[in-house]
């Protein structure tokens, strides 16, 4: 991750190699966190290179997909509990709606009125699947529509900072 961040010019971040779900948002190291890039483990169904290596890798089993989606939901909801959080980017290299669009409304409902979706790269034409109000703010790519790897991005921002 450090190599990727340096490659794209990110210099104002701190990486922590910990179990994210075990991190306390009130820990002095994290209570002033304003921005989170959440890229949890996923099926990788949007990664064409995985499918070339293993043709069966493109479609996860329902059991694996359910387990991954559960973990992703816990991670997303946990990230939204950081008291100073202003903006979160949720990204997936998956084509599965269960890992992408289905995560967003559930997380927003856990924090009613505290967060909203912000447009993710609004100039890009390919948006999230219309599965919930606001999905048009999400970004979705796939080998079929964008001739790229598959991915999903949702930008969630705090409506009002806590006092």
Swiss-Prot record:
Keywords: Methyltransferase, RNA-binding, S-adenosyl-L-methionine, Transferase, Williams-Beuren syndrome. GO terms for biological process: RNA methylation; RNA processing. Gene3D superfamilies: Vaccinia Virus protein VP39. It comes from the Eukaryota. SUPFAM superfamilies: S-adenosyl-L-methionine-dependent methyltransferases. The active site is at residue 93. Its EC number is 2.1.1.-. It is linked to NSUN5P1 is located in the Williams-Beuren syndrome (WBS) critical region. WBS results from a hemizygous deletion of several genes on chromosome 7q11.23, thought to arise as a consequence of unequal crossing over between highly homologous low-copy repeat sequences flanking the deleted region. This is Putative NOL1/NOP2/Sun domain family member 5B. It comes from Homo sapiens. The gene is NSUN5P1.
